[in-house]
Amino acid sequence: VQEILTKKPELPQDIRWHMIGHLQRNKVKYIVGKVELIHSVDTYRLAEEINIQAKKQNVIVPILVEVNIAHEESKFGISAEDAILLVEEISKLENIRIKGLMTIAPYVENPEDNRLYFRKIKQLSVDITNKNIDNVFMEILSMGMTGDYMVAIEEGATMVRVGTGIFGERNYKQE
């Protein structure tokens, strides 16, 4: 959130910003209306806060529901088993549009090791689509990063995160 708030005023206004990291509820007010898509909604409480802030600004906020497909304790995201229920609950919020799912697969040496996870989330996306839930559009399947994006695309990814491949390793130390 801080990075968006710092860089957005300095860069061209036609850039379409996405919120891709973990989002805390107390930071929601700073990004609603400033980003095209929030990739990391994994609780109803977070979605509810996004909806509250979106109503205040009279905007609709597109989101992706983050699924922890590999059940990794170190990562955020709802379990695949609970994802459909969460999608159904969030779908009732007036100022949110569920545009799809996002997952971050485990870091592996061999990208093939993540194929099963990518298949599982693709199937979850199909299952949600087949439920025909109002206000839910499974248009985006965001999965795959620099090391495994080719396998993710083969398994149905419509969006990949390849920043390291383009920009190199990030330095997260504050200067």
What do these predicted regions represent?
Residues K173-E175:
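Active-site loop ensemble at the mouth of alpha/beta enzyme cores that anchors a bound cofactor
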Residues V1-G147, I153-E155, F167:
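Conserved alpha/beta-domain cores
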Residues G156-T158, G163:
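Active-site-proximal glycine-rich helix-loop-beta segment
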